[in-house]
From Swiss-Prot:
Belongs to the UPF0246 family. HAMAP family: UPF0246. PANTHER family: PEROXIDE STRESS RESISTANCE PROTEIN YAAA, PEROXIDE STRESS RESPONSE PROTEIN YAAA. One of its GO terms (cellular component) is cytosol. It holds the Pfam family H2O2_YaaD. This is UPF0246 protein YaaA. One of its GO terms (biological process) is response to hydroperoxide. Signal peptide: none annotated.
């Protein structure tokens, strides 16, 4: 079973590390090509392209400039400990045991605009390059054209290595769009998280993102290997709703706190 999650815009390169083990990203040659393209952008162009403030654009221009192909624990950090958005608040990888990291390294993948596919312990230098950004490059007009089948092929390698054919899609639509489902050698299962608001159940972005992290943690902590085991997920008040679910979609609901 292979879990897919999105990266985060918020990064943490200050907190103490809970493991010293690391691996290197497998698609660094591709990342280097994107850095070459990104370095051509001025801060105002970055601001416009990413729809971010001038201050953030300056920070990210500096990150592109400072990026170097030789990754060490001094200039990079394990991806699962560097990302700090809503998904990672639910995941809480900073509390993982070494055995948890082992299982995650085999069963969890982060899709990345810059790095393509990251394993949890892959070192990562700081960046911001969302998959949906229209960064023109030698392979096309955006990052989807740049990555082509590369991400899908890398996921197929991971599935083959574990002798499995199930993908748990906990990534956002923006990131999963970089995967080619017809070329993926797997059954795709998508957990959906609905929260009650004013008597109606719907997707509330902040809660749904955190729930994707909670589900990832649930799978890792309990060493789950079969999709039917996901129905036992009950973190922070969520419960499985079989009536609303289908073969490819597992629906989890949570009542409004009153």
């Amino acid at each position: 079973m292979l879990i897919l999650i999105s990266p985060a815009k918020t990064l943490d390169y200050q907190s103490p590390l809970t493991t010293t083990r690391y691996t290197l990203p497998e698609l660094l040659d591709n990342a280097q090509q994107l850095i070459h393209e990104a370095r051509k952008l001025t801060p105002p162009q970055i601001s416009s392209l990413m729809r971010i403030s001038d201050k953030l654009a300056g920070i990210n221009a500096a990150r592109f400039h400072d990026w170097q192909p030789n990754f060490t624990p001094e200039n990079a950090r394990q991806a699962i400990l560097a990302f700090k958005g809503d998904v990672y608040t639910g995941l809480q990888a900073e509390t993982f045991s070494e055995d948890d990291f082992d299982f995650a390294q085999q069963h969890l993948r982060m899709i990345s605009g810059l790095y393509g596919v990251l394993r949890p312990l892959d070192l990562m230098q700081p960046y911001r390059l969302e998959m949906g950004i229209r960064l023109e490059n030698a392979r096309g007009k955006d990052l989807y054209q740049f990555w082509g089948d590369i991400i899908t092929n890398k996921l197929n390698e991971a599935l083959a290595a574990q002798g499995d054919n199930v993908v748990i899609n906990l990534a956002s639509d923006e990131y999963f769009k970089s995967v080619k489902p017809k070329k993926l050698n797997a059954e795709i299962i998508k957990p959906v998280f609905l929260d009650e608001k004013n008597g109606k159940f719907k997707i509330i972005s902040f809660y749904a993102k955190k729930a994707r992290g909670l589900m990832s943690r649930f799978i890792i902590e309990n060493r789950l290997t079969k999709p039917e085991q996901l129905t036992g997920f009950n973190s922070e008040g969520y419960f499985f709703d079989e009536a609303s679910s289908s073969n490819g979609e597992l629906v989890f609901k949570r009542y409004e706190q009153r």
